[in-house]
From Swiss-Prot:
Keyword annotations of the record: Acyltransferase, Lipoprotein, Membrane, Palmitate, Transferase, Transmembrane, Transmembrane helix
Cross-referenced Pfam families: DHHC
Subcellular localization: Membrane
Molecular function per GO: protein-cysteine S-palmitoyltransferase activity
Similarity comment: Belongs to the DHHC palmitoyltransferase family. PFA5 subfamily.
Gene: PFA5
Protein name per its UniProtKB record: Palmitoyltransferase PFA5
Organism of provenance: Candida albicans (strain SC5314 / ATCC MYA-2876) (Yeast)
Length: 405
């Protein structure tokens, strides 16, 4: 975990940033609540207006604290440790029966994490900060001090909303009472700091919040976006190398990270298996705007496990209400976690319990993606699994060692 002594010795810088955030927040409280709220507004203007300021800032800071604690308490979402997949259909009870579809490398091997000795779920990522594979890993938030994943993503969004509201209130009060401060003789220097800090953080948090609203709407992660951008940079670099007339100052001296954006799925085809290629920007997990938002709020941020009747317009409207209003989302989030636990325990009594557990924790792909796979299979636009001719059953997984952060 992030509070392990040996981890803190090597990563104390990551702990210093949240501490600095708390210290800056403490100063901002002094500046806005005392220097502005009390000395200027309460004493020289209106008791009621000052009390409203204190109540609003107190409420949104309580929201910050609650969601900050919940982000740590709930965690980003831990992937179970899965044994290898039974690629050769040996009916080994210790292996996961072959799924109809799983994400793989170019040869058809499922991704295997050597750090956790487990098969990797799609979009999971091993984080050294917590010591396990995070389901639907998004990013490590240096300001909060915790990885953001499937389980604490909604709390992260609410945390940003609270911080944004805090700075908007600060900016409004500063703009309203700056003239009164000048009329007192000389502007309080705390106003300058408050203007700079609130303006800067409103822009920063507002842009970040807008980006993540887009991610929710299309069911993407920050890691997906990074991969797409790396692919664009790599393609620009390749095009620049092919163009001899391009000025030297426009050419990148150091080659970027090689990222083609090509991904692969291993699918059941007739009596065998097929490896189908796709690209990262095809968004296989995007279930549509309505379903994505309902899943975030009412389905534990999973993209499956509910019937079509669950995704009504009324429930979409309710999801927006729960998303906007602080604190009322908390019971729904914990209910979503309990639902995952119930689904696993219910399925584990069946014969293929490992496959059932693997399916519950995995994400499903959308119909558009499945249609794309079917079209490629019909056109014979696929390849045979490399492990059927190149490997032995003792070496049947693709090992990933470089995915740790």
């Amino acid at each position: 975990m992030i509070w392990r002594k040996e981890y803190l010795k090597k990563n104390y810088i990551k702990l210093l940033v949240p501490i600095c955030v708390v210290l800056v927040l403490a100063y901002l409280n002094y500046a806005i609540n005392y220097a502005v709220g009390y000395k200027l507004v309460y004493v020289h203007h209106s008791h009621a207006v000052a009390i409203i300021l204190w109540v609003l800032l107190g409420f949104f800071q309580l929201e910050l604290l609650v969601y900050w604690v919940l982000i740590f308490l709930v965690g980003p979402g831990k992937s179970p440790v899965f044994p290898p997949i039974d690629l050769y259909s040996e009916n080994n009870k210790g292996l996961i029966p072959l799924p109809d579809l799983f994400f793989c490398d170019e040869k058809g091997f499922p991704y295997y994490c050597s750090n956790s000795n487990s098969i990797k779920l799609e979009r999971s990522f091993f984080s050294k900060d917590v010591g396990y594979n995070v389901i639907k890993f998004d990013h490590y938030c240096i300001w909060i001090g915790q990885p953001i994943g499937q389980d604490n993503y909604l709390f992260f969004m609410k945390f940003m909303m609270g911080f944004l509201a805090f700075f908007i209130i600060v900016l409004i009060y500063c703009a309203r009472f700056t003239r009164e401060s000048i009329q007192q003789g000389e502007i309080d220097h705390n106003f300058i700091v408050l203007f700079v800090m609130s303006g800067f953080w409103i822009i920063m948090i507002g842009c970040l919040f807008g980006i993540h609203l887009r991610y929710v709407s299309i069911n993407m992660t920050t890691l997906d976006e990074i991969t797409i951008n790396q692919r664009k940079r790599y393609n620009r670099w390749k095009d620049a190398r092919k163009n001899p007339n391009m000025p030297s100052w426009m050419k990148t001296k150091n080659p970027p990270r090689k990222e083609t954006g090509r991904k692969y799925v291993n699918v059941k085809h007739k009596t065998g298996r097929a490896i189908v290629r796709y690209y990262i920007d095809e968004r296989p997990f995007d279930m549509g705007f309505r379903r994505n938002w309902i899943n975030l709020v009412f389905n534990g941020n999973r993209n499956h496990g509910k019937d079509d009747e669950f995704y009504t317009l009324w429930r979409l409207a309710a999801a927006f209400v729960v998303f906007i209003i602080p604190f009322i989302d908390i019971p729904f989030s914990f209910r979503g976690k309990l639902q995952v636990k119930d689904d696993v325990e219910q399925e584990l009594h069946e014969q293929e319990n490992l496959l059932a557990k693997y399916t519950v924790y995995s994400s499903v792909v959308n119909d558009k993606f499945m249609n794309m796979i079917d079209e490629k299979l019909k056109k014979n636009s696929y390849s045979a699994p490399g492990y059927l001719v190149e490997t032995t059953p003792q070496n049947n997984q693709s090992t990933i060692d470089k995915d740790s952060i």
